[in-house]
Structures are given as structure tokens and as C-alpha cells.
């Protein structure tokens, strides 16, 4: 039985800082299949640290993956420049190994059975518990942390943030293919990831004390051994004083990454301010949140989403434009107006899942060409 806790301290952040984690995949330059060479890449880049001591490259479950991590930043622009610098180092380290880097929610044709696991007590326990489903986690995402000042704001913000789940997923959806087949989904990663027992949508707790009771119960019954084992789509990160948004598929370009990170930053800061002003944040019933998640995973930018507790519906891109207009003043205050404005261009240019399908169609179904395109998109 795991140790239990009576309280979960939340180290509030005095400012709405931002940090980003970017999971990327290693692929062979010739075959374009996944390459289990992360250990060699880590050896080549060495111990990279951000200005605040944060490790900038970290291991993940599979040895075909590198996670690039920023330090704590005041602006999205600074965070993305941090990522760009580390990404350049990772690509230079991978190049002599015959390896390229790309980012998407899934690889178009790789097979899970050939992927090697990273050995660690945490990952060993995860695979022992989850077995076949755990071995299937050939997926990549982007996680955005935003600082929150007080623990009692966390769940009001988190619960309201769930109303924008489909917007964030539709914009970032980049996993239409799995093991050589088009799944028919914009984000197959989303449905794969929720198969893990501690993944999926968060519970909509009313306050921090309810969350502490939940953590106590989960630790006592051995559901997870420490809070890092809680893999919700949005979760509190008490150690850092942040809300961590983990909805997004892997994002293939720096420009899209900056735009979606700015969107998340603005959403959380806007909700924080509304709570300060005495407003009651808008929420959706859990059944609507669950349905919106599925619709965005299935239909992407063509999803019709449920917008309120009265079950009204709207095209996600129409609702998105109203949201962006509402957030413009917040973006100006946070210094990310240009990045937020870029969000509106993603539906015009096509989200990654749409671009991947377009490349596949133009190459008569050649999925190697899809990986080629994703590798080249990393320069954008």
C-alpha cells in the first residue's frame, strides 16, 4: 500500500508564468521508421539546463522519444525561443546518428512491437500494471504549464477550461494515422492515451480539499504512488504552482506551438482575472465535456461542439473566433498578441491532421512522404 497524505501543498505562483514541454520523436533518415536512439542523443547533447536549472532534455517511456523542456518564463515568445534553442541542439546531436526529429501525435506507420522501453522504476511499474495498453503508448504531446497564485483558484479555472477542450484539441490534432492505416480520427492519440487507468478527463472538484481527499484515496489504494502518476488531460502541478494543460497532440511547427501556447496562457489568465473580479466561471456538465472531447478527436476542426449547459451547439471554429476576440486584451497584457492572432490562421492553413492526409493523398498513400513532410515542418 502506498503512503497516504492528509494535505497536498500548492506552491502558488506569484505571477502567471509559462513553461512548455514538447515531446518529439526520433526517426531514421532513410526508412523514416522510429529510431530507438534516445540514449545516444542524450549522451551527445549532455546535461542541458535552462536559466533556472530546469533540465532541458528528459527521457520518456519509449527510447524513440525526447522531451524538450523550457525553464520558467514570463512570455510565450521567450518560452518558444528556449525550445527552439534546445531543439537545434537535439537535431545536431541526432544528425550524425542518421536520425531526424519530428513532432506529431502519432507516427503514421510504426509498429509498437519494435519500440524499446526506457528502464526506470516508474516506467517499469507503469508497464507491469498496464501491459498491452501501456506498450501501445507510441504517442507524443505538448504540455503547457501556467502559474496560478492560489490553490482555491485551481479547480474553478480547470473546470471552466474544460469548455475549451475541443478547441485546443481540434487546433493541435495531428494523429490521423496509426500503424499504416488512416483511423478516420483527427486525433487517434487522444483515444489511445485515455486507455491508461489514470489518464483522461479530470474530475470537476469544487475545491482543493476535495482534491486532497481524492489524492488520499488514490494513494491509499495504490492507484498511483505519487502525483506524477496522475495523467489527466488537465491537472494541477502543486510542486510548481501551475495548471498543466496536456490536451494537445504533438505540434509540428514552432509557429503553431507558439500560437496554441499563447491561447492556453491567455485562457488561464483570463479565467484567473474573472475569478478575481467575482465572476462565476462557465462550466459544462461532465457528459458534455466527454462528448466534446470525442467529437474533437473524431472530427477535428469540423466538430460541432456543445457550448453550454443548455445543450446548444456550434461549429468549433466559429466559437473559436469569438474566444480569440475576447482574449485579445489579455494577449496584449501578456505580450503574446501576435502569437494569439496566429491561432486564427490554423484553420485557414489546415491543421496537421489535414496536412498529413493531403500529403498521403498526393503521394498515392506513401506514408514515408508524410514523415518527410513532418520532418521539414520542424523548420517552420
Swiss-Prot record:
Keywords: ATP-binding, Ligase, Nucleotide-binding
Domain of life, per lineage: Bacteria
Reaction catalysed by this enzyme: L-cysteine + L-glutamate + ATP = gamma-L-glutamyl-L-cysteine + ADP + phosphate + H(+)
EC number(s) on file: 6.3.2.2
GO MF assignments: ATP binding; glutamate-cysteine ligase activity
Gene3D superfamilies membership: 3.30.590.20
EC class (word): ligase
Similarity comment: Belongs to the glutamate--cysteine ligase type 2 family. YbdK subfamily.
Function summary: ATP-dependent carboxylate-amine ligase which exhibits weak glutamate--cysteine ligase activity.
Protein name per the record: Putative glutamate--cysteine ligase 2-2
Organism (species): Nocardia farcinica (strain IFM 10152)
